[in-house]
A protein has these predicted regions:
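Conserved AdoMet
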Residues: 62-117
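Short glycine/proline-enriched loop/turn "hinge" motifs that connect secondary-structure elements
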Residues: 115-121, 170-171
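Short glycine-rich, basic-tinged beta-strand/loop micro-motifs
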Residues: 119-135
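Active-site periphery "cap/insert" segments of enzyme catalytic domains
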Residues: 150
Length: 379
């Protein structure tokens, strides 16, 4: 049986993967997190003595994508699937431009040219398409046409649920990329939760928040998420470092109970302390506790009402955070209304902005903002 790192017998009809002098992996993350992914990847590669990898961000011209090449003997595949900041890691097979007309026929023709001996060794396959951009076709149209081309060529059965191999035929605006994922489900879907709110933070974003916070995994420190929701940020923090003391709070007691259930399922009940409380009254929730880091995803107005005054809301929580933070502590938060947060920061004068990055999270495109608490002389 082949190990994960054995070269797969896949070709584009022109170049066989096993004949290339390098390993290739195509990474897909949330647009805007390219540098976070690159930094995480470089750290992982250096731990394995790969000091000169070829990492290209936005290789096809789009955010959220990286193309990685390493020497053939390096375990790139095993390294890629351990990354916390990505959704997918693919072995890239082929990519091509889409014509303005008859795009589906062109996709079917290009996929039909591929030499994929792997399909001769399995009982079933499926085609999965992720699509960004505006087109006159849908993702399932691509899946049907590409799947039909491969079925005609190899005769391998199509099984949408219990397939042996998944061929990704992804559409990025005007470019089609064909690849085989190194994993069965998105790498960001790593927590099985009994309690899952309708709007939940992806684990990849949670990892990015911790990275933006410059939290030293070798140092003992305390971390609070005062809008903890289902607990994703704290679960990711528990993996990030065993030296962190973790606290979570939420205004909704039902949410707190759900987060506790999730922590129990993940065997993290001894590592995270949850408490019910309003972040706008943090001094009463944690009257004696001070934190080195606050990492959180404040609500976008859904749980505090659609007519939430964001500027007033941000001013209030920034003030409350300041009192419960140690000198020189950091805050990392997601801000849907950056202009309102910016005004609140200016009016309070309690923090220095360290970093700001806009991230495409699908339906919303908020900013991740990293802050440093400013020490006051009267403190």
């Amino acid at each position: 049986m082949k190990s994960q790192e054995d070269p797969q017998e896949i070709t584009t009809g022109l170049v066989a993967t096993q004949d290339l002098p390098e390993n290739h992996v195509f990474l897909i993350a949330d647009p805007g997190l390219e540098e976070i992914v690159k930094n995480e990847l470089q750290a992982c590669l250096q731990k394995n003595s790969c000091n000169n990898p070829n990492i290209v961000t936005r290789p096809l011209g789009f955010d959220g994508q990286l193309w990685v090449k390493t020497p053939k003997g390096f375990p790139l595949h095993a390294t890629a699937v351990k990354l916390r900041s990505i959704h997918h890691a693919l072995i890239p097979i082929h990519y091509f431009d889409l014509p303005t007309e008859n795009a589906l026929a062109h996709i079917e023709n290009e996929v039909g040219k591929l030499s994929l001996p792997l399909l001769n060794t399995v009982n079933s396959f499926r085609v999965t398409t992720q699509r960004t951009g505006k087109h006159n076709f849908k993702s399932n149209d691509v899946e049907r046409r590409a799947g039909a081309a491969l079925w005609r060529k190899y005769g391998t059965s199509v099984d949408l649920k219990n397939h042996d191999v998944d061929i990704h035929v992804n559409i990025f605006e005007h470019i089609c990329l064909v690849g085989i994922p190194l994993h069965k489900k998105p790498l960001s879907n790593r927590y099985r939760k009994q309690f899952q709110p309708r709007i939940a933070l992806k684990a990849s974003i949670a990892h990015a928040l911790l990275a933006f916070g410059k939290i030293d995994p070798t140092a003992t420190s305390t971390v609070l998420d005062p809008f903890c929701g289902s607990g994703t940020i704290l679960f990711e923090a528990a993996h990030y470092s065993s030296k962190l003391s973790l606290y979570g709070s939420d205004i909704d007691p039902h949410v707190v109970k759900g987060a506790q259930m999730n922590a129990e399922d993940l065997n993290l009940t001894n590592k995270i302390q949850f408490i019910q409380g309003d972040a706008r009254e943090l001094n009463t929730v944690f009257p004696q506790q001070r934190f080195n880091h606050i990492v959180t995803n404040p609500p976008y107005g859904l749980r505090f009402g659609q007519h939430l005054n964001f500027e007033r809301f941000y001013i209030r929580i920034l003030q409350q955070f300041w009192y419960r933070l140690t000198p020189d502590a950091t805050v990392v938060l997601i801000a849907l209304k950056w202009e309102k947060l910016s005004a609140a920061l200016r009016l309070t004068g309690l923090y220095k902005i360290l970093e700001k990055q806009r991230v495409d999270m699908g339906n919303v495109k908020p900013h991740i903002v990293s802050l440093r608490r400013i020490q006051k002389e009267t403190e």
